[in-house]
């Protein structure tokens, strides 16, 4: 390196300033004078070594105001030659040096332009290192300013490595190069380190185009040019710098790098800036690339406190930095790229390699622009040259052989950042902010051709960026991966003229993958086509994974997704547009307030209809998604909200193909609006909502179908806390454009949706799709199912409205749910309830010719296997009159409409409204001759209450099947008959519990119908709850009532126009109906209202009419129940034009009830019961017989007897047949009045009745019954009676046939007026009569009573006193406690006894038990004497059952006792001389008792009872003497003793009188007993842990030496009959065993207890007591 020659920086200035020309090549010399072009006073050291040159700066060193750019003066008009003017003052505005100047001058042409020369301050043309540093320990600053050169590096040029180290300040300002590197040009690496502050400002790299001077006389004029001083200097530089033989100096040939690039720095090698405080690049310009920095390799910033790259500009690429290699910013605090501009890409950064942001506090890329904008232009600061018009004209002219070069299309990608490869961001602790950048091409904020990876960082934000094409915030051509980001990852207020307002990913196989983000936000972004927030073709996914479970077994969730306020003004996907959106394991998801002018206001993910990007050809080889793959998936999220989104077409919230939302705690879909379908969701195939704790779908709106949810297949399952669909609306006109409703309750689509702007791209022309109508206010689907949901599931105030101003024709169906094919709701949890409330379908302005149906639900197939409530739902039509010639259809199904409808479990319908089927109605599914519509209610309880049908039927269908536990139709109303059920083919009602039709009302008196020929006829409304109408069919409808496990009842069903007045017409069933009645054994079908049926059959023959079978055996099921007609509530006259056959069971005609039939036949084994005034009659439409085989007359009600009658007898009536009768029955048939009865001649009995005859056939037993005993209380029976009428019969002889008639039943009453009946079998008066023989009057029915119970209760009283005595002997006395030192004691005991006595010849079986409490206190006046007193209370119960006579006794007892007890230890002296004595113990108890008894005796067979109250007084005396056989010793506590006892008890029962049934008076009686128990006992103590337990066991034989047999006399008050009852006393001998124990817990407390059992031959008594003793 010794041959190297170095040109010092001062050489440049020495050539210009002769005063310093002697110091051109200093070596290791301290220089202390000015080295600037103007003036400076600083210390500056230059050291030249073999490896390079080193400058040590002390203090402030500056090099300013120098240029080598020659200035050409313009020539005058009259001069033919031009002479340059030499000036020492350089004009920095001149631009006369061409970029294409020759590198070596032509010796023959003295006017040639000198070669470009740079490095005005420092110039190094060799490969050695050029370094600048501060003196150790001394601050040093370097300033290079206003140096403008024709060559590379305006201030510094170095072919070798360039180093800046440890400078306090470095200022490169206002410098210019007409090639590259306005401030610095480095031919190798450039490094800055340890700089406190470095400023690169207002530097420029500009390539000046070649200028041509015009020659006015080219043929004759010559130009003489003399070199200027500047030219001499350039020649000197060339010479001094070209001493090498090969001539490879930097200025000897055309440069290989990019001229016009690197406004501040141009580096052919790596550029590294590290370990510095503040680095600023500002207002630098480049006419090509890299407004501030251009690097042919890598650019690296490391450990920078503040980095600012701002207000720089490039005419082409990289307004701030252009790097052909990679860009790395690491370990720094603040990095700012602000207000930089470029015209062809990378407004701030244009990187051909990778970009790496790592370990930073914050990095901001703001207000940068890429492209040409009218608002601001790049201005270059260059030396100016005066140019005349002729020169411009000459420069613009080209030779004849010149071919214009076509201008390539200019792209301007990446308003803030452009990278040809990958962008990596990691460990940013503050913020990554890319805001307010613009690009006229793609990527307003950033353009990344490779992958973008951001991890372990805080706040990645793209805001207010804009693109004239795609990707307003971010545009990438490869996958984006975001992981472990904290704060908000934000894309906000970005705009794009094409797709992807927030971000855009190019390519069908690229994804946006996010893991572990705190918050991902797409907010207020806008695109002019698709994807307002984001456009990602393949997939967008966000999830959270964690290896740590805070709670075992529970996967943690974290993070949120917010997609809000985004707009796609000319396409789909206002929030996001992607083929797959997957969000899982998150805390919160919010998709809100987004807008799309086509589909998917919040998200568009439908792969089949996925919108292709602008100017792109859809791929023809895309891989089809798997059939089970979900293109929209939200899983395992705490809270999800999809609200306030809007779409001009479909799916305001989400537009997808297959969507699934699962395992969500709270899901809210609300306030979304779409002009066509799916306000909340629109899925072309399926939508699944699974395992959601709380689901709310509210206030969504669609113009046609599915205000809330729209899907081909919709499955909702496993909801844990129910769901809520409320205030969702489908509201539109027939053209598909929403109109404004006339009321505030009917919102329209247009009021919610913004209009597309004028600049929006027009939507492609499409054909109007075919819609089912305005359907599905909350839900639309082809197949809809709900399963395994729990809690309360609500559908409230959803609606479908057609607001067409006039002549609408759309169907309006399914206010809450519309299922095109089927709807299924299943619930396994019995507490689950589905509530449909105030849902509606309607026309808002005009009546429609379409079908309005299903206020809450519409589907051809409806299956509800759950508990449901339908309340306040309606299907209604506008009240305006329709245009002439139109025929609006009746509205159907206020709650449910469909073809086949099946309900099970429990359903409640209330206050629903429609024309037909106020609650449930069916729509035609076939021809009128083959009706397939059917309503089935089964296996549950069903209630229909206060529903209103504007025409007919709470239930309306051709076929109805009801089979349930409890079925109620209550207070429903209709205009015409059929207020509860209207059917046209068949109906079956089977009760498994109770079926009740009550209080239903018909408001109109007449029903108008159109007959054949167009004539209108009126028929009478009877107020029928059930109405059958076959229409034009020739056969009657069929109605079958089956009371299988419960009763069926019709009551108070009426026709009443004025509801304020009481009704006068009541009817249960009407219409053209063939009726069948079946009641199981013990069950009843009750008609408290009339039946008024008609028939399509005609003719006068009985066999021309249908048969009404009552209790006919069917399918091996035998029916033997009751069918009842009753006029208890109001008049009941039933007309049934059928032949009635009573097969089994019972037919009851209550008092004054009438049944008119064609004929009546009673089969053997059945029973016909008629009460007084009842009428069974045939009708006048045909001849028909009444064949009665055993008639029962219920005499409970007397009816209205006439003179000579004991009661009003029932009537068997025959009426004459009219010649013109036929088919009328109850609807129009005339019924003759009852004929007057007159004498009739005897008739011959007919054994086989002919049912076609107009005759009464009466045979078998005539049974009189009086179940309540009322009839025989009639005083008229107090005398003998003859010819008492029992039955009214026809008076015409040939109309009566009586044979083998017998009288039976309650003929001999047991109480009341008793007597006997005899039958007069000859009905000679048109009646069946009988004679009555009076016997006597009895008030009560007699039943024998043996009455032992009252006497036996004495034994219970005795036992209650013995149990107290046993407690005192065995506990309180306890061998008189002579070994006990305690003197005063308080005792509390619980006592109980049980006495059982078997039945004996003298007594009945009975039992007695009692329980109570005893307290006692005693003292020991002397050690050998004890005295105490006790008080006891017992509560007992006595029970006895006499099975033979069917009566039972139940008695209660209250016993109160007072006792005195004592004990004395004595010695009986046997031998005084020897001192022999026999010790013995004397114990005694005296008790007095007062016992109260309260007893009830029940007589179930006669439904009677007695009550008796009495008192007992008792005494008990007991004396026990015991003598030790073995006494305790010091070694043993055992004692063996013999004892004898004297026990006397006396119980006296006081007199008393019974009340209620046949009372008796009982006299006093007493029971006395003296017994002498004799036996032995054994005692012993056990000691453990200072606790003493003393036990005693005694056994005794107990003979009774005296007793009496209690005898009680009584009188029967009603008859003065006297008798006596003897008490069944126990046997004389019995045995007794006793066990007692005492547990000494310490000196003051003792626990004790005893158990006694007495066993006799017929008796067993058990007695026990236990308690505690306190010593004081």
Curated annotation (Swiss-Prot):
Membrane topology, as annotated, equals: Peripheral membrane protein
The Gene Ontology CC terms held by the record are: cell outer membrane; extracellular region
Please provide, alphabetically and separated by semicolons, the GO molecular function terms listed in this UniProt record.
ubiquitin binding
Is Transmembrane found in the keyword set? yes
| Domain Autotransporter stretches | 1379-1672
Q: Where is the composition biased (Low complexity)?
A: 77-88, 100-111, 203-234, 734-744
Give the UniProt keywords, A-Z: Cell outer membrane, Cell wall, Membrane, Secreted, Signal, Transmembrane, Transmembrane beta strand
Q: Name one GO biological process term.
A: double-strand break repair via homologous recombination
User: Quick one: where's region Disordered?
Assistant: 69-122, 203-263, 384-415, 734-765
**Pfam short name (any one):** ChlamPMP_M
Q: Hey, what's the signal peptide range on this chain?
A: 1-14
Main localization is secreted
Compartment(s) = Secreted, Cell wall; Cell outer membrane
* Bias (Polar residues): 235-256, 384-399
Asked if the record carries the keyword Zinc-finger, the reply is no
Q: Which InterPro entries match?
A: Autotransporte_beta, Autotransporte_beta_dom_sf, PbH1, Polymorphic_membr_middle, POMP_repeat, WDR48
Q: Which family does it belong to?
A: Belongs to the PMP outer membrane protein family.
Give the protein's recorded name: Probable outer membrane protein PmpB
């Amino acid at each position: 390196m010794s041959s190297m020659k170095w040109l010092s920086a001062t050489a440049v200035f020495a050539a210009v300033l002769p005063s310093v020309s002697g110091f051109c090549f200093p070596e290791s010399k301290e220089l202390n004078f000015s080295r600037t072009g103007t003036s400076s006073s600083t210390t500056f050291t230059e050291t030249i070594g073999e490896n390079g040159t080193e400058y040590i700066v002390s203090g402030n060193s500056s090099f300013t105001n120098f240029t080598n750019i020659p200035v050409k003066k313009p020539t005058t008009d009259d001069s033919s030659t031009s002479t340059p003017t030499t000036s020492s003052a350089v004009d920095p505005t001149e631009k006369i040096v061409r970029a294409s100047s020759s590198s070596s001058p032509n010796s023959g042409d003295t006017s040639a332009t000198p070669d470009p020369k740079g490095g005005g301050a420092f110039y190094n043309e060799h490969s050695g290192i050029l370094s600048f540093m501060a003196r150790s320990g001394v601050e040093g600053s370097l300033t290079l300013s206003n140096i403008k050169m024709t060559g590379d590096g305006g201030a510094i040029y170095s072919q070798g490595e360039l180093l800046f180290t440890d400078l306090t300040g470095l200022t490169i300002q206002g410098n210019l190069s007409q090639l590259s590197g306005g401030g610095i040009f480095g031919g190798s690496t450039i490094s800055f380190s340890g700089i406190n502050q470095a400023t690169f400002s207002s530097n420029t790299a500009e390539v000046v185009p070649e200028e041509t001077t015009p020659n006015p006389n080219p043929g004759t004029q010559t130009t003489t040019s003399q070199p200027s001083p500047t030219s001499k200097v350039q020649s000197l530089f060339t010479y001094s710098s070209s001493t090498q033989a090969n001539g490879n100096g930097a200025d000897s040939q055309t440069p290989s790098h990019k001229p016009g690039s690197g406004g501040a720095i141009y580096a052919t090698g790596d550029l590294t800036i590290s370990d510095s405080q503040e680095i600023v690049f500002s207002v630098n310009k480049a006419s090509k690339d890299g407004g501030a920095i251009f690097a042919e390799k890598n650019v690296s910033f490391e450990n920078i406190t503040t980095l600012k790259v701002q207000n720089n500009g490039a005419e082409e690429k990289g307004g701030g930095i252009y790097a052909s290699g990679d860009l790395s910013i690491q370990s720094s605090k603040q990095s700012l790229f602000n207000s930089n501009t470029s015209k062809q890409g990378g407004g701030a950064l244009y990187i051909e390699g990778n970009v790496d942001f790592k370990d930073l506090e914050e990095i901001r890329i703001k207000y940068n622009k890429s492209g040409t904008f009218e608002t601001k232009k790049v201005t270059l600061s260059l030396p100016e040259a005066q140019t005349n018009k002729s020169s411009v004209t000459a420069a613009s002219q080209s030779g004849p052989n010149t071919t214009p070069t076509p201008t390539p299309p200019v792209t301007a990608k990446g308003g803030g950042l452009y990278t040809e490869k990958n962008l990596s961001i990691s460990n940013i602790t503050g913020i990554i902010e890319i805001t307010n950048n613009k690009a006229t091409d793609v990527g307003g904020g950033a353009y990344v051709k490779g992958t973008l990876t951001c991890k372990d960082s805080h706040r990645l934000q793209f805001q207010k960026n804009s693109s004239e094409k795609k990707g307003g915030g971010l545009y990438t051509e490869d996958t984006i991966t975001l992981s472990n980001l904290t704060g908000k990852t934000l894309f906000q207020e970005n705009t794009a003229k094409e797709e992807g307002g927030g971000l855009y990913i190019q390519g069908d196989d690229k994804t946006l993958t996010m893991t572990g983000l705190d918050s991902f936000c797409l907010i207020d972004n806008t695109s002019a086509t698709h994807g307002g927030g984001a456009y990602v073709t393949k997939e967008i996914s966000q999830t959270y994974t964690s290896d740590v479970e805070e709670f075992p077994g529970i996967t943690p969730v974290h993070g949120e997704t917010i997609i809000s306020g985004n707009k796609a003004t000319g396409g789909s996907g206002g929030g996001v547009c992607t083929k797959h959106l997957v969000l899982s394991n998150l805390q919160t998801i919010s998709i809100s307030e987004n807008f799309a002018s086509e589909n998917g206001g919040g998200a568009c993910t439908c792969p089949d209809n996925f919108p292709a990007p602008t100017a792109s050809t859809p791929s023809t080889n895309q891989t089809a998604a798997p059939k089970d793959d979900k293109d929209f998936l939200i899983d395992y999220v705490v809270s999800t909200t999809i609200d306030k989104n809007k779409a001009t077409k479909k799916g305001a919230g989400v537009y997808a193909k297959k969507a699934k939302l699962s395992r969500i705690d709270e899901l809210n879909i609300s306030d979304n609006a779409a002009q066509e379908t799916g306000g909340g969701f629109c899925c072309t195939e399926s939508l699944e909502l699974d395992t959601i704790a709380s689901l709310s779908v509210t206030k969504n709106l669609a113009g046609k179908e599915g205000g809330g949810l729209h899907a081909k297949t919709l499955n909702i399952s496993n909801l844990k806390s129910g769901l809520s669909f409320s205030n969702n609306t489908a509201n539109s006109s027939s053209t598909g454009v929403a109109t404004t409703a006339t009321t505030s309750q009917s919102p329209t689509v247009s009021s919610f949706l913004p209009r597309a702007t004028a600049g929006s791209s027009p939507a492609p022309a499409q054909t109007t799709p075919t819609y089912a109508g305005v359907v599905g206010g909350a839900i639309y689907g082809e197949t809809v199912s709900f399963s395994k949901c729990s809690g309360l599931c609500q559908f409230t105030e959803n609606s479908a409205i057609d607001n067409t101003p006039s002549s609408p024709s759309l169907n309006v169906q399914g206010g809450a749910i519309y299922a095109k094919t089927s709807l299924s709701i299943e619930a396994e949890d019995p507490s689950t309830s589905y509530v449909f409330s105030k849902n509606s379908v309607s026309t808002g302005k005009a009546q429609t010719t379409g079908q309005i149906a299903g206020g809450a639900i519409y589907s051809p197939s409806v299956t509800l296997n759950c508990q449901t409530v339908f309340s306040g739902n309606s299907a209604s039509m506008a009240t305006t009159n329709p245009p002439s010639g139109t025929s609006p259809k009746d509205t159907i199904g206020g709650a449910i409409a469909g073809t086949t409808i099946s309900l099970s479990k429990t359903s409640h319908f209330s206050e629903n409204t429609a024309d037909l089927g106020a609650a449930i109605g069916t729509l035609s599914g076939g021809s009128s001759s083959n009706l397939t519509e059917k309503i089935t209610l089964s296996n549950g309880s069903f209630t229909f209450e206060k529903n209103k049908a504007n025409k007919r039927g709470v239930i309306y269908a051709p076929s109805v099947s009801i089979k349930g536990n409890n079925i109620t139709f209550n207070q429903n109303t209709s205009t015409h008959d059929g207020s509860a059920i209207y059917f046209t083919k068949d109906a079956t009602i089977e009760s498994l519990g109770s079926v009740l039709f009550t209080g239903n009302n018909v408001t109109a008196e007449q029903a108008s119908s159109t007959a054949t020929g167009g004539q209108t006829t009126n028929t009478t409304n009877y107020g029928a709850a059930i109405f059958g109408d076959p229409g034009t069919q020739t056969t009657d409808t069929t109605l079958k009532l089956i009371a299988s496990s419960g009763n069926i009842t019709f009551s108070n069903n009426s026709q009443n126009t004025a509801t304020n007045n009481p009704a006068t017409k009541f009817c249960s069933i009407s219409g053209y109906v063939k009726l069948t009645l079946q009641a199981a054994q013990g069950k009843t079908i009750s008609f408290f209202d009339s039946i008024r049926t008609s028939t399509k059959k005609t003719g006068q023959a009985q066999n021309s009419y249908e048969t009404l079978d009552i209790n006919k055996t069917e399918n091996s099921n035998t029916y033997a129940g009751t069918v009842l007609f009753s006029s208890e509530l109001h008049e009941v006259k039933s007309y049934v034009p059928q032949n009635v056959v009573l097969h089994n069971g019972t037919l009851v005609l209550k008092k004054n009830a009438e049944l008119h039939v064609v004929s009546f036949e009673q089969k053997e084994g059945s029973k016909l019961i008629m009460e007084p005034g009842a009428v069974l009659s045939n009708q006048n439409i045909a001849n028909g017989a009444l064949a009665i085989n055993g008639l029962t007359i219920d005499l409970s009600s007397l009816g209205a007897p006439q003179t000579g009658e004991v009661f009003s007898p029932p009537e068997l009536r025959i009426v004459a047949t009219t010649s013109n009768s036929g088919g009328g029955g109850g609807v129009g048939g005339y019924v003759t009045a009852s004929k007057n009865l007159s004498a009739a001649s005897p008739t011959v009995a007919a054994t086989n009745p002919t049912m076609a005859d107009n005759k009464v056939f009466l045979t078998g037993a005539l049974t009189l019954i009086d179940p309540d005993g009322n009839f025989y209380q009639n005083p008229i029976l107090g005398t003998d009676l003859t010819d008492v009428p029992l039955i009214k019969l026809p008076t015409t002889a040939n109309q009566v046939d009586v044979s083998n008639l017998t009288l039976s039943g309650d003929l001999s009453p047991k109480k009341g007026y008793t007597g006997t009946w005899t039958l007069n079998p000859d009905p000679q008066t048109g009646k069946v009569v009988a004679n009555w023989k009076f016997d006597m009057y009895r008030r009560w029915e007699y039943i024998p009573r043996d009455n032992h119970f009252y006497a036996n209760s004495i034994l219970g009283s005795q036992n209650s006193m013995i149990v107290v005595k046993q407690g005192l002997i065995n506990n309180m006395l306890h061998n008189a406690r002579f070994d006990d030192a305690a003197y005063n004691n308080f005792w509390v005991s619980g006592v109980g006894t049980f006495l059982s006595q078997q039945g004996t010849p003298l007594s009945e079986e009975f039992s007695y038990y009692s329980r109570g409490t005893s307290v006692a206190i005693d003292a020991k006046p002397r050690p050998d004497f004890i005295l105490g007193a006790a008080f006891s209370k017992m509560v007992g119960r006595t029970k006895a059952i006499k099975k033979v006579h069917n009566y039972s006794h139940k008695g209660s007892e209250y016993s109160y006792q007072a006792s005195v007890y004592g004990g004395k230890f004595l010695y009986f002296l046997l031998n005084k001389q020897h001192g022999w004595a026999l010790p013995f113990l004397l114990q005694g108890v005296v008790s007095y008792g007062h016992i109260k008894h309260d007893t009830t005796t029940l007589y179930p067979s006669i439904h009677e009872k007695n009550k008796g109250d009495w008192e007992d007084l008792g005494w008990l005396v007991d004396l026990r003497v015991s003598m030790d056989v073995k006494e305790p010793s010091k070694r043993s506590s055992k004692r063996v003793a013999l004892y004898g006892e004297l026990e006397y008890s006396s119980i006296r029962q006081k007199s008393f009188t019974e009340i209620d049934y046949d009372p008796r008076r009982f006299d006093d009686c007493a029971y006395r007993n003296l017994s002498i128990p004799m036996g032995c006992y054994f005692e012993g103590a056990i000691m453990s842990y200072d606790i003493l337990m003393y036990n005693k066991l005694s056994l005794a034989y107990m003979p009774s030496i005296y007793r009496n047999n209690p005898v009680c006399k009584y009188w029967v008050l009603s008859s003065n009959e006297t008798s006596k009852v003897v008490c069944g006393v126990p046997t004389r001998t019995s045995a007794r065993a006793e066990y007692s124990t005492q547990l000494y817990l310490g000196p003051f407390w003792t626990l004790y207890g005893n158990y006694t059992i007495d066993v006799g031959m017929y008796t067993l008594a058990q007695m026990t007591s236990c308690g505690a003793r306190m010593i004081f």
